[in-house]
């Protein structure tokens, strides 16, 4: 991964969205139908400079170096709550300000606003988007141990204190309602629900969070885990005047690359001089059949090495959030977090954050609802949403291209399932579907799995 590390060192990161007004209200994406009212709402918010974080400033919750020893001593005398791997990932998210202006695990009022309104109302009356609950569950025994204490210490599975939660509030964990409102179904088999909710405690504890030191995973990828503040600093060094974010949890194929390069071309046509792509793979919990993070990062490296994406205009960084697979509800969180990292444009595709129905043979969400919801979501008015055109393999040109409905017979749609099947069988996709180096990484990954394995490496957690 040395070469991609060099890319990062050469590629400053963008954080506050840089925007410019467009007298013709031209959209910075190719021939996408978009309601004129929504179009005016988005383009009208364009202005110069990196976009400000939600609430006006990043809320970073890491204790300053001189106070860390003292805080660790304090933690030793407080009631203890042990965190799961996913709890630690959410602590990481909170600590760096991805959820700004949230200052800790949610209290009940914040939880209810998130469930019912997908937003939080701030003291000044303004509204910021918040579509997924960031909460910490405890059981009856832990609740009893806490008693009347107003503070608790959070510990990792190794027994080390990692944070202090103060001015706490404990309230009921309405699991069924949480699941129904977040996913739109209570069907069995939802990956995040099975992992983090079903067996969680019946109480939630919220409060003000102090994280005792920066979160590290020691997995060889920490250099890619740039905080919103670090992204902003690097992007400002680059003098980027637009930042367009692309979230993914899958390997990059040439269709993705086409969408990203076409977006940059459109931004240049709008008059921007130095638009920067934030390629931002999700680094938290993912379901069992997704390619693990370390292999995805190897694959992304090859995409840059092979010149599919330009290293000079691409920033690769890891987004630490766990994945819900909650479709239009979750995609709002993905977009909101990128505002805090400085992105003013967000690329959204077909069925973002979606998955197949866990019981029935159909998609869980309408494929178009994600981009439609983003165009209307409360608190996302400052973010320019870029729905992209459908890309498929053009058999006449031997490459990925935008789908032309006038000649559908010329196009081949290669699904994720088909891609995985080809890689597992050590077969090659059509030339032009993915760069050879990137495809080899996928083949190597599937070859590394034992027949008895479940296709997953152990979950990486902070240490």
Swiss-Prot record:
Its EC number is 2.7.7.4. It catalyses: sulfate + ATP + H(+) = adenosine 5'-phosphosulfate + diphosphate. It is found in: Plastid, Chloroplast stroma. Disulfide bonds: none annotated. The keyword DNA-binding does not apply. Induction: Repressed locally and systemically by phloem-translocated glutathione (GSH). Pathway: Sulfur metabolism; hydrogen sulfide biosynthesis; sulfite from sulfate: step 1/3. InterPro entries: ATP-Sase_PUA-like_dom (IPR025980), PUA-like_sf (IPR015947), Rossmann-like_a/b/a_fold (IPR014729), Sulfurylase_cat_dom (IPR024951), Sulphate_adenylyltransferase (IPR002650). The keyword Metal-binding does not apply. Residues 1-48 form a transit peptide. Pfam families: ATP-sulfurylase, PUA_2. GO terms for biological process: hydrogen sulfide biosynthetic process; response to cadmium ion; selenium compound metabolic process; sulfate assimilation. Keywords: ATP-binding, Chloroplast, Nucleotide-binding, Nucleotidyltransferase, Plastid, Transferase, Transit peptide. One of its GO terms (molecular function) is sulfate adenylyltransferase (ATP) activity. GO terms for cellular component: chloroplast; chloroplast stroma. Belongs to the sulfate adenylyltransferase family. Homotetramer. Mediates selenate (Se) reduction, and promotes Se and sulfur (S) uptake and assimilation. This is ATP sulfurylase 1, chloroplastic.
């Amino acid at each position: 991964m040395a070469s991609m590390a060099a890319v990062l060192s050469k590629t400053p990161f963008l954080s506050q969205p840089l925007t410019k007004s467009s007298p013709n209200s031209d959209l910075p994406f190719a021939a996408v139908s978009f309601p004129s009212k929504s179009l005016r709402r988005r383009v009208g918010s364009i202005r110069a400079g990196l976009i400000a974080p939600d609430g006006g400033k990043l809320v970073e919750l890491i204790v300053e170096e001189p106070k860390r020893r003292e805080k660790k001593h304090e933690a030793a005398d407080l009631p203890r709550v042990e965190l799961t791997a996913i709890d630690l990932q959410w602590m990481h998210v909170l600590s760096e300000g991805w959820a700004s202006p949230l200052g800790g695990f949610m209290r009940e009022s914040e939880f209810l606003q998130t469930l019912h309104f997908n937003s939080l109302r701030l003291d000044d009356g303004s509204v910021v988007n918040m579509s997924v609950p960031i909460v910490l569950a405890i059981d009856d025994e832990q609740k009893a141990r806490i008693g009347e204490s107003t503070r608790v210490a959070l510990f990792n599975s190794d027994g080390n204190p990692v944070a202090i939660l103060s001015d706490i509030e404990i309230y009921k964990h309405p699991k069924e309602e949480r699941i129904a409102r977040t996913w739109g179904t209570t069907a069995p088999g939802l990956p995040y629900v099975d992992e983090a909710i079903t067996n969680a405690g019946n109480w939630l504890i919220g409060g003000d969070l102090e994280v005792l030191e920066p979160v590290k995973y020691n997995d060889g990828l920490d250099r890619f885990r740039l905080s919103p503040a670090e992204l902003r600093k690097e992007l400002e060094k680059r003098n980027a005047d637009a930042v367009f974010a692309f979230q993914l949890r899958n390997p990059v194929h040439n269709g993705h690359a086409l969408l990203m390069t076409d977006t940059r071309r459109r931004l240049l046509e709008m008059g921007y001089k130095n638009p920067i792509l934030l390629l931002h793979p999700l680094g938290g919990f993912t379901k069992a059949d997704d390619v693990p993070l370390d292999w995805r990062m190897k694959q992304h490296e090859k995409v840059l090495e092979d010149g599919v994406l330009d290293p000079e205009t691409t920033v690769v960084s890891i987004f630490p959030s766990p994945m819900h697979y909650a479709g239009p509800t979750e995609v709002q969180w993905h977009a909101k977090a990128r505002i805090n990292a400085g992105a003013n444009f967000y690329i959204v595709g077909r069925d973002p954050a979606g998955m197949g129905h866990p019981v029935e043979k159909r998609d869980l969400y309408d494929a178009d609802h994600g981009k439609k919801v983003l165009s209307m979501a409360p608190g996302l008015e400052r973010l320019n949403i870029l729905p992209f055109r459908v890309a498929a393999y053009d058999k006449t040109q031997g490459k990925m291209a935008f789908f032309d409905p006038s000649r559908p017979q010329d196009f081949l749609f290669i699904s994720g399932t088909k891609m995985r099947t080809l890689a597992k069988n050590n077969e090659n996709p059509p030339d032009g579907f993915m760069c050879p180096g990137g495809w080899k990484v996928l083949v190597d990954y599937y070859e590394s799995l034992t027949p008895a394995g479940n296709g997953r490496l152990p979950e990486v957690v902070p240490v």
